[in-house]
């Protein structure tokens, strides 16, 4: 199993061609995948209409995975997660960052979201970067 960098464990049903995922996202159509219909309408996933690169460090998603939370609940539905795959095979999850954090009054709409890798998102936390551009440093 390839190492992953994200916040929780997921059960992976499989991977989908990134271009195919983006087409479904643009057309707002569910993805038929191994007997499941995967929705593409959540605010989190619609963030990737803005791009598939981290707004801070610039790494780009290279795979889309059909996954569900691995918490043992059968009610957990499958959804799409995007990952950047490093040369060593490590998968870095791409997330939907709130530009103006919700904890500081930020809205839940698409205008207040940007794609960001989990590493930068965890470093950013609840900081507002446009007022403190040096708040986080990218990995080198």
Describe these PLM feature segments.
Residues 52-53, 95, 116:
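The −1 position to Zn-ligating cysteines in a subset of zinc-ribbon hairpins
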Residues 71-73, 133-136:
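Glycine-rich, phosphate-binding/catalytic loops in enzymes
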Residues 61-113, 128:
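Histidine-centered nuclease catalytic patch
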Residues 139-140:
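Short, intrinsically disordered terminal segments enriched in charged and Pro/Gly residues
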Residues 57-60, 102, 119-123:
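Cys/His-rich metal-chelating microdomains
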Residues 6, 10, 24, 36, ...:
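Histidine (H) residue identity feature
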Residues 109, 113-135:
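Short Cys/His-centered divalent metal-binding micro-motifs
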Residues 1-53, 58-65:
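A boundary/linker detector
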